Amino acid sequence: MDNAFSPSDLKTILHSKRANVYYLQHCRILVNGGRVEYVTEEGNQSLYWNIPIANTSVVMLGTGTSVTQAAMREFARAGVMIGFCGGGGTPLFAANEAEVAVSWLSPQSEYRPTEYLQDWVSFWFDDEKRLAAAIAFQQVRITQIRQHWLGSRLSRESRFTFKSEHLQALLDRYQKGLTDCRTSNDVLVQEAMMTKALYRLAANAVSYGDFTRAKRGGGTDLANRFLDHGNYLAYGLAAVSTWVLGLPHGLAVLHGKTRRGGLVFDVADLIKDALVLPQAFIAAMEGEDEQEFRQRCLTAFQQSEALDVMIGSLQDVASKLSQVVR
């Protein structure tokens, strides 16, 4: 009797509705008794933990991990995105002028739809339309920050207190600045100013003290480490959203056409400031460990339907700027 599953048996849950995102370190991933499991060592014991692949969107493998060919085959059949990255949200490879933040292996067991790829490519070579896409992404980003920073969930965090009018003024200023942008570099300048101001606002909201955002995973304080870690989880969701729609990671609209995987960073930015940033500072002041913070982020992603936001934003931009005649 053939007990093998077909890919269609495993893809019954839409990616945007899948509940699980995994970040694993110091373990082995294998197939045991027909199930994909990760194995951890505690003393002389090997502990086996099930990964429900049909309800998992992305698995990120950090330092000290190995994965068998059989496990990779099952991940592909279930449509699970795999990302190899450094430990605790640091780049996988870094050198003088080259950095690989995450190396992605997308499921290859089925063809992806071409509708959104055709729409995306039809405008992507036009500088003005690519700029319009970048600004549209930033508008979504602003909406997400307003919604979640001023929402009921964050207002219940007694450690995170700030004046809403300060945030509103900051976002209004950024929104106005976007209307004057003529190039993607103009957008990047405005974005950098806005992000720096958000860091300052968040640090003050929890009485964190002096804070400087470290680059390339070089931060040693808790807030920087948690920001890196949470951002990598956002990259995982972003990679899934682009794969679901059949969009190559190289077709960025803001992070540069030559940066590897730039579209993943563009899409992750839609929710990073809204969801990861405040949680990183709250968790740092609570003295949480990485696992507790990771659960904070995943809960926030699920409750806010972050993957839905990413997929919907990509679809909206693709359809509105498309030059394809149908």
Swiss-Prot record:
Chain positions recorded as Mn(2+) binding sites: E191, H255, D269
Top-level taxon of the source organism: Bacteria
Biotech exploitation of the protein: If the spacer DNA has a perfect match in the chromosome then toxicity results. Suppression of the toxic effects occurs via mutations in the CRISPR/Cas machinery, or via target deletion, which might contribute to genome plasticity. This CRISPR/Cas system can be used to remove genomic islands, and possibly other genomic regions.
Induction notes from the record: Expressed in late exponential phase (other phases not tested); part of a large cas-CRISPR3 polycistronic operon.
Record note on quaternary structure: Homodimer. Interacts with Cas3, in the absence of crRNA.
Record-listed E.C. numbers: 3.1.-.-
Gene3D superfamilies: CRISPR-associated endonuclease Cas1, C-terminal domain, CRISPR-associated endonuclease Cas1, N-terminal domain
Sections of the chain in a coiled coil: none
GO molecular function terms noted in the UniProt entry: DNA binding; DNA endonuclease activity; metal ion binding
Origin species: Pectobacterium atrosepticum (strain SCRI 1043 / ATCC BAA-672)
Family affiliation: Belongs to the CRISPR-associated endonuclease Cas1 family.
Cofactor dependency: Mg(2+); Mn(2+)
GO-annotated biological processes: defense response to virus; maintenance of CRISPR repeat elements
Name of the protein in question: CRISPR-associated endonuclease Cas1
Stretch forming the signal peptide: none
Role, per record: CRISPR (clustered regularly interspaced short palindromic repeat), is an adaptive immune system that provides protection against mobile genetic elements (viruses, transposable elements and conjugative plasmids). CRISPR clusters contain sequences complementary to antecedent mobile elements and target invading nucleic acids. CRISPR clusters are transcribed and processed into CRISPR RNA (crRNA). Acts as a dsDNA endonuclease. Involved in the integration of spacer DNA into the CRISPR cassette.
Keywords: Antiviral defense, DNA-binding, Endonuclease, Hydrolase, Magnesium, Manganese, Metal-binding, Nuclease
